[in-house]
Amino acid sequence: MYNPPNNSNSFSNVDDDALAAHLKISQYEEFRLTDAVRPAMDLKIKPSQGYRHDVYVDDETGAKVPVIMAAASAEILFPLFMELVGRLGPMVDVVLETSHDTTAGSHTDMYRDHIDAPVLASTLWDYEDLLMNDGCTGIAVLNPNTPQEVQFDEHKLLIIYGSPLEPFEFNLEQRGVHCCPDMRFITEAEHIHSSSEQLELRFDQLRTELGLDGSHEPNQEEDHGFDFQV
């Protein structure tokens, strides 16, 4: 069931047939979406492939961290994510992110330190369906010694933190994801997250397999998205 939170969004006054037709659209030109998210009805931001550079500023320290934000078409997205993770080294930390059973605009982070990268990679491949198609699940893999991080968020965007970024740019360009300084992402406008009870069960299985039954931390963040449960 889809239930818009207010009357001031592009989904207002849209009948069920029009909404259903919009949700079925999985490709815009050459860009294929996963099942996790859909753009606004008004398509103020049309999904497309590319990346841009940005800067993350730590609220506490004021430190500036270089960032790459990227969107990739579904057919190359997960292999690209795994290639980026492979650059982090043989031992990594992992953060599993979920907005299952949370209030709108928030998610819960679950932490696991010191996991062998090959072991993690094998597990992530086993859960490719969940990570690609659940709009309530995201994951971040990081090397705290570098420090660098690769995030595959709930919107299925790739976000890379740290320096140097050139090796990650190489992987992006090699896959046909090119730099676009004016790139805009689906997160910068209204959008719909999609999930299901089956995917929530898969999330619980992944959480258990990664040993993430503890170390939960709520995280409040701004998001223009609405949840859609199927």
Q: Which role does the model predict for each range below?
A:
Residues 1-157, 161-230:
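Structured alpha/beta or helical-core interaction and ligand-binding surfaces enriched in interleaved
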